[in-house]
């Protein structure tokens, strides 16, 4: 599509969708620079350079394939395809773990055909890696409520979840509090399960304590890795032929536009200060964007945050609202808005189906865990993310949990209809 200029307002000639995945424009330049560094100075220099983990992984894919594919999205398609298949596999596993195999298959099928997820998993974004690790964590947490682990398997599950949480910290550290709350909530549900069944599940509890401990230590360990800056003096250049953005110039890591400096948050700041800082950061990062919402709202106290909670939950669950579905977007145009409107309509249906599933399966602790994680995540995002385009991508993980619940709700309706017809 990009090479033949079929949608020039949406895709560059290298396949990057700069209208809906603008980050890819920057990440492809960094990836090319890392390939140059790898070929020129070797693997040690490549490993030492400061760059985000997902960009380094994309650079490895390019290092193998750029001579065949050029620096286009095809060069990272094997890695993105792996992410996509892992996401589908994990959604299936989660549906099977919480409900049954049929629900897992239906949930994975819905996910496989989700239009914007398909589009985003063709780009150079952090989202596919984040979603994969996020689903691993959720699957580990859900398994505490469905399985009886030996202490050895409990340790392995805790380490697997902890490793995934460490990668999430490196890829999207803003989600750390949400993930820690997820692990603590799952631990609380595990305690409830033990009281209900009147037995002590040592292996499960060991795994949960281990995961929570690793998550709590992640910020301290993360500070030892300076992976959040891209210093030009380290010699990362992207002077490669074939990487031609839409403006016809060669993209390089050295000539990329400078990002405006934003204030930093002092270490050890309380949670309300962090929420206020993150919201201000999102507002400052998207000046004049057509999909901004409530940019006039800033938090100056805990009371401000508490008063905004209902609005934040509404934004997290339902935005973009129907009045935005048919308005032309600044970057994505009318087609992008229509697609997001179609998907939001489906999400409304899925949310209703999820509520029906919980009503029919109210005894399933893992199902309630998925719901509460989804609500907590979307509430947190509604609090701090004032740009709907960013919110849209960051909600995918929590949408996938709702899709699992919605798939079970749909199957419950089919079962009820079948039983009625048989009578």
Predicted regions and their residues:
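Transmembrane-helix signature of polytopic, membrane-embedded enzymes
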Residues: 74, 91-113
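Membrane-interface alpha helices of multi-pass inner-membrane proteins
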Residues: 119, 156-179, 209-213
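Short acidic/glycine- and proline-prone juxtamembrane loop motifs at membrane-interface regions
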Residues: 122-129
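Short hydrophobic/aromatic helix or loop-helix immediately within or flanking a transmembrane segment
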Residues: 23-71
């Amino acid at each position: 599509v990009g090479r033949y200029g079929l949608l020039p307002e949406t895709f560059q000639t290298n396949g990057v969708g700069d209208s809906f995945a603008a980050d890819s424009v920057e990440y492809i330049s960094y990836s090319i620079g890392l390939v140059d560094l790898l070929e020129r100075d070797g693997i040690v220099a490549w490993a030492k350079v400061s760059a985000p983990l997902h960009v380094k992984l994309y650079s490895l894919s390019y290092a193998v394939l750029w001579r065949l594919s050029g620096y286009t999205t095809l060069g990272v398609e094997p890695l993105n395809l792996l992410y996509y298949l892992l996401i589908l596999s994990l959604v299936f596993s989660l549906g099977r773990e919480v409900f049954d195999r049929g629900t897992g298959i239906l949930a994975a099928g819905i996910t496989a055909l989700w239009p914007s997820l398909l589009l985003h998993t063709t780009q150079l974004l952090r989202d596919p890696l984040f979603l994969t690790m996020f689903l691993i964590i959720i699957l580990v947490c859900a398994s505490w409520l469905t399985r009886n682990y030996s202490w050895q398997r409990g340790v392995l599950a805790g380490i697997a979840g902890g490793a995934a949480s460490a990668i999430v910290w490196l890829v999207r550290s803003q989600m750390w509090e949400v993930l820690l709350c997820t692990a603590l909530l799952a631990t609380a549900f595990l305690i409830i399960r033990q009281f209900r069944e009147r037995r002590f599940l040592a292996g499960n509890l060991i795994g949960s304590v281990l995961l929570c401990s690793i998550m709590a230590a992640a910020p301290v360990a993360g500070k030892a890795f300076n992976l959040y800056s891209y210093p030009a003096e380290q010699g990362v250049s992207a002077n490669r032929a074939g990487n031609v953005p839409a403006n016809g110039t060669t993209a390089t890591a050295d000539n990329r536009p400078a990002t405006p400096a934003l204030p930093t948050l002092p270490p050890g700041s309380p949670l309300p200060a962090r929420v206020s800082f993150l919201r201000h950061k999102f507002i400052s990062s998207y000046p004049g964007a057509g999909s901004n919402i409530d940019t006039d709202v800033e938090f100056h106290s805990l009371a401000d945050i508490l008063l905004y909670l209902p609005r934040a939950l509404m934004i997290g669950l339902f935005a973009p609202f129907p009045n935005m579905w048919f308005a032309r977007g600044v970057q994505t145009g009318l087609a992008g808005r229509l697609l997001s409107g179609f998907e939001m309509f489906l999400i409304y249906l899925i949310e209703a189906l999820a509520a029906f599933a919980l009503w029919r399966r109210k005894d399933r602790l893992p199902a309630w865990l998925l719901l509460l994680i989804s609500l907590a995540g979307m509430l947190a995002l509604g609090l701090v993310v004032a740009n709907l385009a960013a919110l849209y991508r960051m909600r995918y993980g929590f949408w996938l949990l709702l899709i699992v619940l919605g798939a079970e709700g749909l199957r419950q309706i089919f079962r009820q209809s079948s039983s009625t017809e048989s009578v």
